[in-house]
Regions:
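N-terminal onset of structured domains
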Residues: 1-75, 82-133
Length: 133
């Protein structure tokens, strides 16, 4: 019971790690890898897993309190409503295509953001840099 309370506020809760097969990508290329979920001290319900490929760039508005903006290029949703048991480790392969995109700037790299939406708890996150060829 106490473990459920701790995991609901993010202590010893589910963790996520995303590993990409290649750190380099070209436009019209595909991006693939493995997402691994590590169960915490209690079973948790994952509402969904979302992968987003984004470009980050400096905000041109100098008066803004938000110094960095994101341009979301592509999103992939994996799984809906799965249970991850206590201390369970589960891996899932993913692959999605990067269509011809219009960048806001001329970035050297993109960010692959992984967000695991966890019911009644703090969500789990991971970020990886993907360099452009």
């Amino acid at each position: 019971m106490f473990e459920n309370l701790l995991t609901s506020i993010g202590i010893n809760s589910l963790k996520v790690d995303t590993l990409v097969k290649s750190e380099y990508i070209s436009p019209n290329d595909s991006l693939s890898g493995i997402i691994t979920l590590y169960g915490g001290n209690a079973t948790q319900l994952v509402n969904k897993i979302e992968l987003s490929l984004v470009e980050r760039y400096d905000n041109p508005d100098e008066r803004s309190q938000i110094p960095v903006l994101e341009n979301e290029l592509e999103t992939l949703i994996l799984h809906k409503n799965i249970n991850i048991n206590k201390e369970e480790q589960r891996s899932e392969e993913f692959k999605f295509n990067l269509p011809e995109v219009s960048f806001k700037r001329n970035p050297d790299y993109l960010i692959l953001k992984t967000r695991v939406y966890i019911a009644n708890s703090v969500d789990a996150y991971d970020e990886d840099k993907i360099f452009l060829k």
